[in-house]
Amino acid sequence: MLTLSLSHFLILGAILFAISVVGIFLNRKNLLVLLMAIELMLLAVNMNFVAFSHYLQDLSGQIFVFFILTVAAAESAIGLAILIVLFRNLKSIHVDDLGSLKG
């Protein structure tokens, strides 16, 4: 029977974090892909917090994850609102076009 240790979760979190960093560096043009990569990065960090919290028998890591998820939800809502305004005005979702939204 396979038991999952802390190192398994940390390795998986590191892999997810690395995938999100690669996604950010390889695709700097598309705003939607950047938002998804940032969300994946936050979820990798959250998974590490929960893993440490579980193995150390401390609930503070899991409570901290709820705060991070709240901030991530607000960040996603604001990012998607900016994305919708950008697409309605310019018919494009490229990061380079964000400078043209100035008042």
Curated annotation (Swiss-Prot):
<protein>
    <recommendedName>
        <fullName>NADH-quinone oxidoreductase subunit K</fullName>
        <ecNumber>7.1.1.-</ecNumber>
    </recommendedName>
</protein>
<dbReference type="GO" id="GO:0048038">
    <property type="term" value="F:quinone binding"/>
</dbReference>
<dbReference type="InterPro" id="IPR039428">
    <property type="entry name" value="NUOK/Mnh_C1-like"/>
</dbReference>
<keyword id="KW-0813">Transport</keyword>
<dbReference type="GO" id="GO:0050136">
    <property type="term" value="F:NADH:ubiquinone reductase (non-electrogenic) activity"/>
</dbReference>
<feature type="transmembrane region" description="Helical">
    <location>
        <begin position="6"/>
        <end position="26"/>
    </location>
</feature>
<feature type="transmembrane region" description="Helical">
    <location>
        <begin position="63"/>
        <end position="83"/>
    </location>
</feature>
<dbReference type="GO" id="GO:0042773">
    <property type="term" value="P:ATP synthesis coupled electron transport"/>
</dbReference>
<keyword id="KW-0812">Transmembrane</keyword>
<comment type="function">
    <text>NDH-1 shuttles electrons from NADH, via FMN and iron-sulfur (Fe-S) centers, to quinones in the respiratory chain. The immediate electron acceptor for the enzyme in this species is believed to be ubiquinone. Couples the redox reaction to proton translocation (for every two electrons transferred, four hydrogen ions are translocated across the cytoplasmic membrane), and thus conserves the redox energy in a proton gradient.</text>
</comment>
<keyword id="KW-1133">Transmembrane helix</keyword>
<feature type="transmembrane region" description="Helical">
    <location>
        <begin position="32"/>
        <end position="52"/>
    </location>
</feature>
<keyword id="KW-0472">Membrane</keyword>
<keyword id="KW-0520">NAD</keyword>
<comment type="similarity">
    <text>Belongs to the complex I subunit 4L family.</text>
</comment>
<keyword id="KW-0874">Quinone</keyword>
<keyword id="KW-1003">Cell membrane</keyword>
<dbReference type="Pfam" id="PF00420">
    <property type="entry name" value="Oxidored_q2"/>
</dbReference>
<dbReference type="GO" id="GO:0005886">
    <property type="term" value="C:plasma membrane"/>
</dbReference>
<comment type="subunit">
    <text>NDH-1 is composed of 14 different subunits. Subunits NuoA, H, J, K, L, M, N constitute the membrane sector of the complex.</text>
</comment>
<keyword id="KW-1278">Translocase</keyword>
<dbReference type="GO" id="GO:0030964">
    <property type="term" value="C:NADH dehydrogenase complex"/>
</dbReference>
<keyword id="KW-0830">Ubiquinone</keyword>
<keyword id="KW-0997">Cell inner membrane</keyword>
<dbReference type="InterPro" id="IPR001133">
    <property type="entry name" value="NADH_UbQ_OxRdtase_chain4L/K"/>
</dbReference>
